From Swiss-Prot:
Lineage of source species: Bacteria, Pseudomonadati, Pseudomonadota, Betaproteobacteria, Burkholderiales
Organism of derivation: Polaromonas naphthalenivorans (strain CJ2)
Pathway: Cofactor biosynthesis; (R)-pantothenate biosynthesis; (R)-pantoate from 3-methyl-2-oxobutanoate: step 1/2
Binding positions (Mg(2+)): D70, D113, E144
Gene field: panB
Annotated GO biological process: pantothenate biosynthetic process
EC code: 2.1.2.11
Matches recorded under CDD domains: KPHMT-like
The name this protein goes by in its record: 3-methyl-2-oxobutanoate hydroxymethyltransferase
């Protein structure tokens, strides 16, 4: 005879969603709380998730921010890049993630990626797209790009929509960049990245993903920004936080693993255990190791 599910679990027809790891000690993440963490130098942890179960497990493992990334185009849909991901797809997966968090009484901060072509035409187009993801349950939207996005960021923030910006390698423009390559390696490109980071902070961005930029440059930008938390991926350990694609950190990549990825599933007792190991490693700054995972 099977046991009835514990009251601390959210039962489904096919299993259970885990509760937050220590519900009494964890409060819902908010923008003021994330700013407080940044101000006190506490590392911010972020992972991608695309469905209810993985979102709930990540939250239970202590991950503070869940990015519903357009990377789902590559890891879930089999696309060769993120360019083909649609706003409707992002809305659907954002709803899945936030539904899972509600059912498991999760506390994570949810960020929805604005896909390619949904914010490029005008500020008004960006607002319409952002509203779709916010109504799907996102707490913040993310968009890629430098100086040309600053007025869009300002426009959204002025209308009450928190924004995470994204510099360095911007996967939506991978064709223009000539592939997945480290950015900011020259003095000129590094100076441009620093200027754009400051402009995005001034426009109101609360977070800034730095992807595949030299560790020294990422650390410099992090120190330069006083009220915009940098989140690194392939940008060394000097950023305010870290993000990885879920499938990568679980070792579910059948191709060549990117330099900045670590397989946290190796030696872990479970998926949740792997996520908890990731959180610990980011918090104690043992991941990323600049000699292994950065440039």
């Amino acid at each position: 005879m099977s046991q009835a599910p514990s009251e601390s679990l959210s039962a489904t027809a096919y299993g259970t969603l885990p509760p937050a790891s220590t519900p009494s000690a964890r409060k819902p993440l908010s923008l003021p709380r994330l700013r407080e963490m940044h101000a006190h130098g506490e590392k911010i942890t972020m992972l991608t998730a695309y469905d209810a179960t993985f979102a709930a497990v990540a939250d239970a493992a202590g991950v503070e921010c869940i990015l519903v990334g357009d990377s789902l185009g590559m890891v879930c849909q089999g696309l060769s890049s993120t360019v083909g991901v649609t706003l409707e797809t992002m809305r659907y997966h954002t709803e899945c993630v936030t539904r899972g968090l509600r059912r498991s009484q999760g506390v994570a901060w949810v960020i929805g990626d604005l896909p390619f072509g949904t914010y490029h035409e005008s500020k008004e187009q960006a607002l319409r797209s952002a509203v779709v993801l916010m109504q799907a349950g996102a707490h913040m939207v993310k968009l890629e790009g430098g100086g040309w996005t600053t007025e869009t960021v300002r426009f959204l923030v002025e209308r009450g929509i928190p924004v995470c910006a994204h510099l360095g390698l911007t996967p939506q423009t991978v064709h223009a960049l000539g592939g997945y390559r480290v950015q900011g390696k020259t003095d000129e490109s590094a100076a441009l990245l620093r200027r754009e980071a400051s402009a995005l902070q001034d426009a109101g961005a609360s977070m800034l993903v730095l992807e595949m930029v030299p560790a020294a440059l990422a650390a410099e930008v992090t120190q330069q920004l006083t009220h915009c938390a940098t989140i690194g991926i392939g940008a060394g350990s000097g950023t305010a936080g870290q993000v990885l694609v879920l499938h990568d950190m679980l070792g579910m990549n059948l191709g060549k693993m990117a330099r900045f990825v670590h397989n946290f599933m190796d030696g872990a007792p479970s998926v949740r255990g792997a996520m908890e190991a990731y959180v610990r490693a980011v918090k104690n700054v043992s991941f990323p190791d600049n000699s292994v995972h950065a440039w």
